[in-house]
């Protein structure tokens, strides 16, 4: 088994977007007794509504990582957003959590968006994984099945965050009220607005409204 600890990458096969599940568990993540509440949730399935205990364990690990990837006050802002804003915000946390998602997004998706062809397919992502494999022994050690699953998971994340059309696989920008982008601008995270596939003139327009 190739050593993972030197690689910045992890597989993303264990947990997809899971918007509603994350929404339900957020109060447990923010609670002062978070650890004991999450342990109880894994055992008793009070809020997650996920039948398998193995899945609950896996999801809780990933939800904790996503929660910790951004400042705690972000989640206070998040709770007051529209559903579309919350979906975008969860995608922001996912980008901050998983380097593979970040690289897929900036090396493949955004290049596609800035080209003539806005269709994003699994093959586009597999090409990026091949590039990563050439420079990262841990990624290179993944089975073809794992690589395919990572690509499928990323595409699911895009669809559920509002960036990829379910039927056509066409990329689509996330358009929100200016107020829902305020956190990113005021926190020096304007790059995320580019990740939402907004053009510079759209970003400037949003800034003038704040």
What residues fall within each predicted segment?
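Eukaryotic partner-binding/assembly regions in large regulatory complexes
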Residues: 1-88
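Positively charged, polyanion-binding regions of nucleic-acid-associated proteins
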Residues: 89-92, 96-119
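Catalytic DNA-binding helix-loop module of base-excision-repair DNA glycosylases/AP lyases
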Residues: 103, 107-109, 124-129, 157, ...
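Long, low-complexity intrinsically disordered regions
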Residues: 109, 113, 133-139
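Non-catalytic, well-ordered alpha-helical scaffold segments
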Residues: 19, 23, 57, 61, ...
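Leucine-rich, amphipathic alpha-helical/linker segments
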Residues: 8-15, 19, 25-28, 32, ...
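Accessory, usually C-terminal, subdomains that scaffold auxiliary metal cofactors
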Residues: 140-210
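DNA-recognition alpha helix
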Residues: 121-137
């Amino acid at each position: 088994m190739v050593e993972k600890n030197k690689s910045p990458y992890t597989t993303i096969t264990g947990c997809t977007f899971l918007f509603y599940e994350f929404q339900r568990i957020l109060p447990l993540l923010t609670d002062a007794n978070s650890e004991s509440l999450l342990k109880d949730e894994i055992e008793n399935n009070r809020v997650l509504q996920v039948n398998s205990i193995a899945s609950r364990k896996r999801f809780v690990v990933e939800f904790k990582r996503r929660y910790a990837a951004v400042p705690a006050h972000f989640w206070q802002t998040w709770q007051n957003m529209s559903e579309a804003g919350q979906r975008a915000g969860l995608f922001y946390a996912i980008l901050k959590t998983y380097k593979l998602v970040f690289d897929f997004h900036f090396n493949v998706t955004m290049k596609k968006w800035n080209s003539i062809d806005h269709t994003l397919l699994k093959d586009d992502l597999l090409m990026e994984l091949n590039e990563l494999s050439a420079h990262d022994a841990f990624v290179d050690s993944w089975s073809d099945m794992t690589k395919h699953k990572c690509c499928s998971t990323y595409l699911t994340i895009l669809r559920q965050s509002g960036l990829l059309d379910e039927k056509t696989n066409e990329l689509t920008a996330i358009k929100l009220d200016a107020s829902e982008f305020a956190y990113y601008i005021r926190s020096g995270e304007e790059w995320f607005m580019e990740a939402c596939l907004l053009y510079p003139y759209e970003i400037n327009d949003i800034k003038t409204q704040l």
